[in-house]
Swiss-Prot record:
Sample GO molecular function, one term: pyrroline-5-carboxylate reductase activity
Name of the protein in its database record: Pyrroline-5-carboxylate reductase 2
Pathway noted in the entry: Amino-acid biosynthesis; L-proline biosynthesis; L-proline from L-glutamate 5-semialdehyde: step 1/1
GO cellular component: mitochondrion
Broad class of enzyme this protein falls into: oxidoreductase
Entry similarity comment: Belongs to the pyrroline-5-carboxylate reductase family.
């Protein structure tokens, strides 16, 4: 297969369309910046994504080569252990006009580059969204540079990297909020922005359970708790304020709010959340170290 001219091609291929890959595709379409027929989804078992073609208009294929040849932006969404095989299979078609965006946990930029053609410089960006991207509400961390680069690229490579970062920011800012961090920080990022979705769901579930105990029906309690959490988050983001500032505005002397907050703190609320996030970050770090060892890639 001969590589296609991709200079004016902005189509997106999601190589490995599992839950996160499909959520990304739907979020990009929901943002209004892409149509579904501009996105190619790949999966070995086509039956699992056939409905996305029939009902939502996405292109689908089981052939990663076909997808890479059609699209300039390649989002890598396979399992970490599958990354080397995937990249080796498409590397002869990957050109300097491609942009590779990896949403794979633990695989470094240098690890990805080691499986591409050494004489072709393709810009690579790592991204860590969460599944709320489907509703354009993701918090996505992205990185394409290390705090401690081993060497500087050429001016042309630096320009390609900057363009790739801007393209990635545009895609993910359309699907929520996006922040650029160093690659080193990507080790811990999932604990806050990806695992964090589950943590906040658990907190909302606990609030809803309390709502049931004080007299609300379960469905109403979940709705009240979720919307209240959403409102609190929006206040912080809109006001660009510290959480304690908003708490101070809500609490009153000897009031119900401070009584509830103090009871929660006496029972370890903040400590439990901090310990949980730190534990997730440590687990993420160990997983990356194991992957680096497996692939013989230095982080």
């Amino acid at each position: 297969m001969v590589a296609t001219d991709l200079k004016n091609n902005k189509n997106i291929a999601i190589l490995g369309s599992g839950n996160l890959g499909v959520s990304i595709a739907r979020g990009i379409v929901a943002s209004g910046h892409y149509k579904s027929n501009q996105i190619v989804l790949t999966r070995r078992t086509l039956e699992k994504i056939q409905h996305l073609k029939d009902e939502e208009g996405f292109q689908i294929t089981s052939d990663n080569l076909e997808a890479a040849n059609k699209c300039a932006i390649l989002i890598i969404g396979v399992l970490p252990a599958q990354v080397p095989q995937l990249l080796e299979s498409i590397k002869h078609l990957v050109t300097k006009d491609h942009i590779i965006i990896s949403v794979v946990l633990g695989i470094t930029i240098s690890g990805i580059r080691s499986h591409l053609q050494p004489d072709v410089y393709t810009p690579i960006v790592r991204a860590m969204p969460n599944t709320a991207i489907q509703y354009c509400e993701s918090m996505t961390c992205i990185a394409n540079k290390s705090d401690h680069p081993t060497k500087s690229g050429t001016a042309e490579q630096e320009l390609a990297d900057q363009n790739a970062l801007e393209v990635t920011e545009k895609i993910f800012n359309c699907c929520g909020e996006c922040i650029t961090i160093s690659e080193e920080a990507m080790v811990s990022a999932p604990a806050l922005c990806s695992c964090g979705t589950a943590f906040f769901c658990r907190i909302i579930r606990a609030a809803a359970s309390a709502g049931c105990e004080i007299g609300f029906h379960a469905e109403d309690a979940v709705r009240i708790a979720a919307q209240t959490a959403k409102g609190a988050a929006i206040m912080l983001l809109k006001n660009d304020s510290h959480p304690e500032s908003e708490i101070d505005r809500i609490t009153t002397p000897s009031g119900a709010t401070i009584a509830g907050l103090n009871t929660m703190e006496h029972n370890g609320l903040s400590s439990a959340i901090i310990k949980g996030i730190v534990m997730s970050a440590e687990k993420s770090s160990k997983s990356q170290a194991a992957l680096n060892k497996l692939n013989n890639v230095s982080s």
